[in-house]
């Protein structure tokens, strides 16, 4: 029974469209096992990772959903491109320095990290091995703080 449930759950997750709230989660989740990052002792880091995995965050892609803003118009106020998880973790100008530090650390644990495509980089960030949870949690927390303090990021 549990094997059938797992199979059906994974099929449903993999079929979620790009407009679905759980689209990213469906791409990240490839089994029904508990994720290793959930064993992290730091509640804040666990919570931040969970929120980004489940698209329960303050990025434009999510805030715009609740305000019925068309997806293509849910832009980062600083960079004027789609404000989604890819942009936040991999490209946003507001956290370049933080990202550089995180990526330097990641390449010590993930061979050839810098050569991965965007999805696989994001997958390693949002499906971290236990040694990386703290560093990724700090990156998320500090990046969100930078966004909140930046006048360009003021939300309507």
Predicted regions and their residues:
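Negatively charged
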Residues: 1
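Family-specific functional microsites
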Residues: 6-156
């Amino acid at each position: 029974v549990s094997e059938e449930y797992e199979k059906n759950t994974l099929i449903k997750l993999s079929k979620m469209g790009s407009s679905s709230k759980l689209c990213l989660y469906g791409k990240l989740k490839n089994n029904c096992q508990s994720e290793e990052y959930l064993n992290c002792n730091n509640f804040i880091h666990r919570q931040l990772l969970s929120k980004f995995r489940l698209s329960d965050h303050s990025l434009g892609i999510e805030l715009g959903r609740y305000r019925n803003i068309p997806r293509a118009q849910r832009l980062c106020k600083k960079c004027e491109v789609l404000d989604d998880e890819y942009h936040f973790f991999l490209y946003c100008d507001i956290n370049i320095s933080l990202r550089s530090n995180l990526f330097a650390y990641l390449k010590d644990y993930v061979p050839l990290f810098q050569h991965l495509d965007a999805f696989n980089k994001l997958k390693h960030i949002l499906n971290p091995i236990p040694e990386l949870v703290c560093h990724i949690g700090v990156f998320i927390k500090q990046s969100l703080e930078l966004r909140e303090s930046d006048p360009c990021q003021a939300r309507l």
